[in-house]
Amino acid sequence: MASGFDALAAAIPQLAGCALVLDHPHYLVVDKPSGLLSQPGLGSHQRDSLITRLQDCCPELRLVHRLDRDTSGLILVARNQISLRSLSALFAARRVHKLYLADVVSPLLGRRGIIHLPLARLQRHPPVYGPHPDGKPCCTLWRKCTQSTDCTRLWLRPLTGRSHQLRAHLAAVGAPIHADRIYAPSDVQGPMHLHAHALSFRDPFDQRRVRVRSVLPSWAQADWAQAEKLRFAGMG
């Protein structure tokens, strides 16, 4: 078997069920499937995660940010601790633009809008977040993509990066995400319809603009031709 990052590129589809979307000298962009933790949780039953699988191939890899277990899509992974510091600084300065696609079970009025609600943790196990006057400031931009009798598809752009931000914001305005088992409990089966589709940032190592898009999950592919015509904020 090949060693180092060549082995990683070859092994990711088999070992992690993920796609290696971008291979850069200082970082990787990986497409995480729904149902997989970004990093280990508490207890041996939560050890399996994206980063533990990747580190089985390359121990020096470091996670720059996280997605919820049930959220699919793009995650930035640093190649080493030195790269991690530079990439983490981009997130801290809010210089990484993220674009999500989601299906919500109730329509939102208008074609676009802003959800500006402070969020706080309301419950610890399982963690639940919701609007609270003492919560952390949170802002989410949304734009309608398509609408049917069953659901409304939205582009979402979080301007802040709080835990459960998109899920809690949409639930708070009466439009929870399809198959969200925390904020929209129901008998609906299948993956949660929330996908981190695109990342955009200025590379801190060579100052070039980086734009990365993922392949959409199966639930989002049917209306993709129309969605392409409604790319949000130049990030689609």
Residue ranges and their predicted role:
Residues 1-236:
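RNA pseudouridine synthases
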